[in-house]
């Protein structure tokens, strides 16, 4: 369980590993979105191919950064992620979002690769979000750390915070709620295959967040499902309703959920 998620949602510095000068690609979008939405912290690009990306100095490797970033975004192919995560551990990075796919959701070798990531994260006490996720938003503070059409949109900050194991579902709910439903969002985070920081970790944080009044969650499965009653009691005591979509209750739904996040620990 992570108790310092304020640092994740409000990072003082962010490093983008694999940052690209092609701003339409997945690896090129996050840096531009952070800039265009007014993120006020320090930005670092890491890619040995470029001297700079979007006006931001580019460093050849994580070890070359002048400071330890609060948050690292990993946008490289699956085969390179384990080495990148080790470098983050050596640098003392507290939080890493792994966007890369090609892990347990693919089966076979991907299962072993994902297990290796979990072991590295545990060894170095890194709060990993992902892999195979779409990123996160902290609307009020301009932390638009992700990719996809919703990240090109400006949103008014609100008091709804949501965590979703599906990026497509979560950001669709956020967009519809904020634009058409009259319930603007404060924070949105996607956890993908969820090897580290869990859906329930984020729900627990939202309960403690004084600016969140309504909590949303999309859950395909949870390895820490035993915490749900406690989470419910905390939310009730705090007067914060939880709206949860729990999928995978039928055999067909379980297969669909497994193919997406490889999360077989149904709650």
PLM features: residue spans?
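Catalytic-core regions of core metabolic enzymes
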Residues: 1-267
């Amino acid at each position: 369980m992570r108790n310092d998620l304020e640092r994740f949602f409000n990072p003082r510095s962010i490093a983008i590993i694999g940052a690209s000068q092609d701003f339409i690609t997945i690896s090129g979008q996050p840096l531009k979105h952070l800039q265009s939405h007014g993120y006020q912290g320090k930005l670092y690009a890491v890619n040995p191919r470029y001297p700079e990306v979007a006006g931001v100095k580019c460093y050849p490797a994580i070890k070359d950064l002048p400071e330890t970033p609060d948050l690292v975004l990993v946008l490289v192919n699956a085969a390179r992620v384990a080495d990148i995560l080790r470098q983050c551990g050596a640098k003392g990075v507290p939080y890493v979002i792994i966007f890369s796919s090609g892990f347990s959701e693919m089966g076979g070798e991907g299962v072993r690769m994902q297990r290796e990531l979990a072991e590295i994260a545990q060894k170095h006490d890194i709060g990993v979000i992902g892999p195979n996720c779409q990123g996160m938003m902290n609307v009020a503070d301009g932390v638009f750390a992700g990719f996809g059409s919703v990240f090109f949109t400006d949103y008014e900050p609100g008091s709804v915070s949501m965590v979703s194991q599906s990026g497509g579902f979560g950001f669709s709910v956020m967009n519809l709620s904020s634009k058409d439903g009259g319930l603007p969002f404060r924070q949105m985070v996607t956890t993908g295959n969820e090897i580290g920081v869990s859906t329930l970790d984020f729900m627990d944080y939202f309960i403690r967040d004084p600016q969140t009044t309504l909590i949303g969650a999309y859950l395909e499965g949870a390895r820490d499902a035993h915490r749900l009653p406690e989470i419910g009691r905390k939310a009730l005591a705090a007067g914060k309703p939880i709206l949860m979509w729990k999928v995978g209750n039928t055999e067909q739904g379980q297969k669909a959920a497994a193919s997406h996040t490889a999360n077989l620990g149904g709650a």
